[in-house]
Amino acid sequence: MTWFDYSLEPKSDIAFIDMKSFYASVECVDRGLHPLKTSLCVMSRADNSTGLILASSPMFKKVFGKSNVGRSYDLPFDVKTRKFSYYNARKQGLPTTIDYVNYIEEWAKSTVIVPPRMDTYIAVNMDIQKIFQDFAAPDDIYPYSIDEGFIDLTSSLNYFVPDKSISRKDKLDIISAAIQKKIWRKTGIYSTVGMSNANPY
């Protein structure tokens, strides 16, 4: 049997960066609202009972228990009146106690519902791509979608963190944090970063 020493494999330092609730965050920032504390959803045809929820803020998801994609009729409140929907609640097995009804209606009143603006999201994405280029060459940046992508920071580690006493893992962590901070300062968007020594292809 032939044994292979994987420690001899080339090392690569990859950061996978994901913008947190990107569309909803862009809409919040554009309105001077906190993207993590505001209940907001991006909905097409909000005037229609079958309006499509394209994106939502973390607070919206927490309060109403919904993911990014869904229909307005899946919500526990009526989009037009912002009143509790007993029909939807029963259909989904949700409680109908007075406390829960009041809770939903209070949040429904303050929830911001906006139409999608793809041109705006693309423009913010371009700003973020420029930030990536402050940390890596264009050939080392691999967009995955409008709100996430890989950056190969292998060639950048020692340039940004030349201290030889710091491990590659810690250097990757330092640079990733710097990227997150710059994205937030430039766009107001929060992001998450996953790091590894793997090939992004």
Regions found by a protein language model. Give the residues of each.
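Gly/Gly-Pro- and Ser/Thr-rich, intrinsically disordered tail segments characteristic of DNA damage-repair
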Residues: 1-201
